[in-house]
């Protein structure tokens, strides 16, 4: 259902990370569907694991909507 992608976000690629080892300290921010800014995709996955949640990626970069020019 591609139409709903805007509402539900994109699945984070959590299988790409070894979450038991933790996440690299890189700043490549993603905004979760919980409207929280995560420093990188791995940290979003890590929080999902810790909290038993399924937060998805709402957008890459900050959570603020780009302001219209």
From Swiss-Prot:
Alphabetized CDD domains for the sequence: KAZAL_PSTI
InterPro entries for this protein: Kazal_dom, Kazal_dom_sf
Site (Reactive bond) location in chain: 25-26
All copies of domain Kazal-like, residue ranges: 8-65
Role noted for this protein: This is a trypsin inhibitor, its physiological function is to prevent the trypsin-catalyzed premature activation of zymogens within the pancreas.
Protein name: Pancreatic secretory trypsin inhibitor
Gene: SPINK1
GO terms, molecular function: serine-type endopeptidase inhibitor activity
PROSITE patterns noted in UniProt: KAZAL_1 (PS00282), KAZAL_2 (PS51465)
